UniProtKB/Swiss-Prot annotation:
GO terms for cellular component: cytoplasm. Mn(2+) binds at residues 27, 81, 163, 167. One of its GO terms (molecular function) is superoxide dismutase activity. Its EC number is 1.15.1.1. InterPro entries: Mn/Fe_SOD, Mn/Fe_SOD_BS, Mn/Fe_SOD_C, Mn/Fe_SOD_N, Mn/Fe_SOD_N_sf, SOD_C_sf. It is an enzyme of class 1 (oxidoreductase). The keyword Cell division does not apply. Keywords: Manganese, Metal-binding, Oxidoreductase. The lineage of its organism: Bacteria, Bacillati, Bacillota, Bacilli, Lactobacillales. Destroys superoxide anion radicals which are normally produced within the cells and which are toxic to biological systems. May play a critical role against oxidative stress, affecting both the survival and the virulence of S.pneumoniae. Homodimer. This is Superoxide dismutase [Mn]. It catalyses: 2 superoxide + 2 H(+) = H2O2 + O2.
Length: 201
């Protein structure tokens, strides 16, 4: 059973005006599909390792050397994007009281968390992701990864992620990444973040 491209949980234009429909079509139907195709091609070379990408990427040294980088790139790309779509919604949501308290305790305030996350997304050189994760100590942490690397490979559990590859924003925002990052905060699905936080603690 091969990895398949998940359907978007909303219409392509549902996140307008923050994320445009053209970008969503290209990002989901083309870019994410390519990661799925390439991950499947890599896995087909070693059927004995199975298809549990989370388990494989949590222990990258266990991945056969000839497909390791392909799975880091494309398996990571699939996992990151499958999560990313679920982390956005056209509905207005807010962090639960428990998550809000954890954010305040870790960062000082929601505004300081937003500033830290924005800085991680803005300063990630080239392509990559900004993340809010639950680290090995069970604490919240803002971090970023290069390319399609996943925090799972560092023993961290991602609960919020933002794709800062240019393909994620260039159609609408051109080279102004900070405007895209600001817009993302208008479409975050805090209900999903809460769910992931509860499961990760």
């Amino acid at each position: 059973m091969a990895i398949i491209l998940p359907e978007l949980p909303y219409a392509y234009d549902a996140l307008e005006p923050y994320i445009d429909a053209e970008t969503m079509h290209l990002h989901h139907d083309k870019h994410h599909q390519t990661y799925v195709n390439n991950a499947n091609a890599a896995l087909e070379k070693h059927p004995e390792i199975g298809e549990d990408l989370e388990a494989l990427l949590a222990d990258v040294e266990s991945i056969p050397a000839d497909i390791r980088q392909a799975l880091i790139n494309n398996g990571g790309g699939h996992l990151n994007h499958a999560l990313f779509w679920e982390l956005m919604t056209p509905e207005k949501t807010a962090p639960s009281a428990e998550l809000a308290a954890a954010i305040d305790a870790t960062f000082g305030s929601f505004e300081e968390f937003q500033a830290a996350f924005t800085a991680a997304a803005t300063t990630r050189f080239g392509s990559g992701w900004a993340w809010l994760v639950v680290n090995k100590e069970g604490k919240l942490e803002v971090t970023s990864t290069a390319n399609q690397d996943t925090p799972i490979s560092e023993g961290k559990k991602p609960i919020l992620g933002l794709d800062v590859w240019e393909h994620a924003y260039y159609v609408k925002y051109r080279n102004v990444r900070p405007d895209y990052i600001k817009a993302f905060f208008s479409v975050i699905n805090w209900n999903k973040v809460d769910e992931l936080y509860a499961a990760a603690k």
